[in-house]
Amino acid sequence: GNLMEDGSLLLQDGKIVALGADIEAPDGAETIDATGRWVTPGIIDNHSHLGVYPSPGVTAHGDGNEISAPVTAEVWSEHGVWPQDPGFTRAIAGGITSLQVLPGSANLFGGRGVILKNVPSRTVQGMKFPDAPYTLKMACGENPKRVYGYGGGRFPGGAPYSRMGNVAG
């Protein structure tokens, strides 16, 4: 968008309701002087592993990859999200207001991703973005080759050995 200097921004219930040069705040509104500062919209993290790979790492809550097979499209990252991951607090401090949490990249098809609002919640259901579609994670390259291919890895003799094998599935 365009740069606006000496403008005003009116928020109501966490949403922008007015933006411009001559906005009057309603009676009782809190005023914040942001002179010399930047105001930006919330950042959308389109590729996140927060909650499935906690930050800092906690082994008991690391649910990013289901490596029982190269294709695990049936698993859902929302079932592995740890809503109390301290990384969510750091992310909101950096401006990330919503994110797509994806499974890891070990598998060709790693499972469903989920769209979350970065809000404090005891459950992942309390963080889900209303009516957002589910997504599907695919990784075609080094990670699936490392985990399943080269005649070694976790599944000796397994595929894929190459990107061609990745695509062939």
Where in the sequence are the language-model features?
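Metal-associated gating/positioning segment near the N- to mid-region
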Residues: 34-103, 107-111
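A signal for specific C-terminal beta-sheet/loop modules enriched in small/flexible residues
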Residues: 13, 25-38, 47, 117-122, ...
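Histidine-rich, glycine-flanked metal-binding segment
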Residues: 1-40, 57
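Glycine-centered flexibility motif
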Residues: 1, 7, 20, 34, ...
